[in-house]
Amino acid sequence: MLPAHKLTLETLLAETVKQVATASQGASEAAFVSPAITLERPKVAAHGDVACNVAMQLAKPLRANPRQLAQQIVDALLAQPQAKGLVEAAEVAGPGFINLRLAAAAKQAVIAAVFAEKEAFGRSQRDAGKHVLIEFVSANPTGPLHVGHGRQAALGDALSNVLASQGYDVHREFYYNDAGVQIQTLALSTQARARGLAPGDAGWPASAYNGEYIAEIARDYLNGVTVAASDGEPVTGARDVEDLEAIRRFAVAYLRREQDMDLQAFGVKFDQYYLESSLYKEGRVEKTVEALIAAGKTYEQEGALWLRTTDDGDDKDRVMRKTDGTYTYFVPDVAYHVAKWERGFTKVINVQGSDHHGTIARVRAGLQGLGVGIPKGYPDYILHKMVTVMRNGEEVKISKRAGSYVTVRDLIEWSGGATPGSEAAVDLIDEETIRRGRDAVRFFLISRKADTEFVFDIDLALKQNDENPVHYVQYAHARICSVIAECKARYSTDESTLADVDVSPLTSERAMALLNKLAEFPDMLQHAADELAPHAVAFYLRDLAGEFHSFYNDRTERVLVDDAAERNARVALLAATRQVLANGLATIGVSAPVKM
């Protein structure tokens, strides 16, 4: 149902309920407070287009039979002049549900709405003026992005688009963990390669990174290559194998650039890259620790500094500063979230792997301990589960380049049709292969709820049939483009006039089902924003594509017919469907091909 129709119906029902309730009680309408009117889609299509349970809500306080009360509301509603043209029929079902069937004209109105709003259809300004920071990916600059980072990128970027569709001012942020033990390991690994060592050689560091990318970094360092991340200063290889700090700076810059390239291939952009090292340089970590000590939220035991996280629901207190004077990994996270708060972001969402579950209570406890007014549930978290990559029925665990895991770039290239293991598949992939791969990976990785494990089947991603969900949706868009092009060629159909077409011939069951699905798009986006559920967009697109294919494959709904009225109405329906498919695909960062 279109938002305008929903608002009208909610208002009508509220007025009708007030009339019926006050008449039965003999009270004044001014004294009656109507409960919130909730409209839902019935689970069974045969039960109508809209269901409402207001009669059951009021039955007890009004001491009335819910079915009888529902019937009174139905009779009064249908008598309202404003209901004409909006509600075709209403009936009482079950214990007192009110089931409404919308008039055909109300359903057909979605076509005019889509033509009027075009790319803006489905969007609203409901949350205009609100600001949200979404942190996602946030990988250590110690290697290429893996498939888990890919799932974060798909989820975080789609969620950003969903919230922006409702008027939010969205700030996308990538937090670089460029301090700590892993960065030291990266430097030592690169130094070992620069000295000519390889994994397995005597003298190779025990905890070193073994991927081929380390050899590439060492080679470019020794050759004096200059590299820079998108927001960083250029760093030139110093060629000195003994200068570990120079190696560290070069390796971090090199991998930040590589991760930028991975994200570019994935079509993801960030508003800001925030460096963990900056927290130490600016004294934010020390300041946060000192504030917690001053607030009495810490204590010393066995040479370590502990945070009283049990005060805020954690199962045990946690070490903040170890006996060697270094901080545990959640301490800079607390300082980082203070920085988010101080920048004015009162709503923050972190998209992270489920392995971060244990840090949630610690970070929130630290923020509460500071006593600076940060709400208890700050920040929000979306935790995703692992991704397993399958090909030819077997799990793929190793990437030649990364050494121990499948990278995002691997997944994009393989899903686009590049051959795993081929040298050409690293740097010489054409744009069309990247587009196909990016579309498949992005759609697949948000096609399940974040808290479910996901099996990414490369073979399925390569299929050009209805089994492949992204192909199924994109083909619906391309198919409509083809039909409209044929209409132009055969009947000189002018797309610019479709907004004025009489769509009253669209009365069949298939047409009504497709119209209903189009009208659900705005509500679906609002629900996805409220529930932080970008997967809802993928679910919707599959359903919409299904309704279109069912309509188009029905021989009684042929579009290319001689009857101009029937043909133009159906072309208008297809054009509206094409627009909504394109809008939905754009929301999740997937292209809408004209040809396939």
UniProtKB/Swiss-Prot annotation:
GO terms for biological process: arginyl-tRNA aminoacylation. One of its GO terms (cellular component) is cytoplasm. It is found in: Cytoplasm. Its EC number is 6.1.1.19. The keyword Transcription regulation does not apply. InterPro entries: aa-tRNA-synth_I_CS, Arg-tRNA-ligase, Arg-tRNA-synth_N, Arg-tRNA-synth_N_sf, ArgRS_core, DALR_anticod-bd, Rossmann-like_a/b/a_fold, tRNAsynth_Ia_anticodon-bd. GO terms for molecular function: arginine-tRNA ligase activity; ATP binding. It holds the Pfam family DALR_1. It catalyses: tRNA(Arg) + L-arginine + ATP = L-arginyl-tRNA(Arg) + AMP + diphosphate. It is an enzyme of class 6 (ligase). Keywords: Aminoacyl-tRNA synthetase, ATP-binding, Cytoplasm, Ligase, Nucleotide-binding, Protein biosynthesis. A motif ('HIGH' region) lies at residues 139-149. Gene3D superfamilies: Arginyl tRNA synthetase N-terminal domain (3.30.1360.70), HUPs (3.40.50.620), Isoleucyl-tRNA Synthetase, Domain 1 (1.10.730.10). Its main location: cytoplasm. SUPFAM superfamilies: Anticodon-binding domain of a subclass of class I aminoacyl-tRNA synthetases, Arginyl-tRNA synthetase (ArgRS), N-terminal 'additional' domain, Nucleotidylyl transferase. Monomer. Belongs to the class-I aminoacyl-tRNA synthetase family. This is Arginine--tRNA ligase. It comes from Paraburkholderia phytofirmans (strain DSM 17436 / LMG 22146 / PsJN).
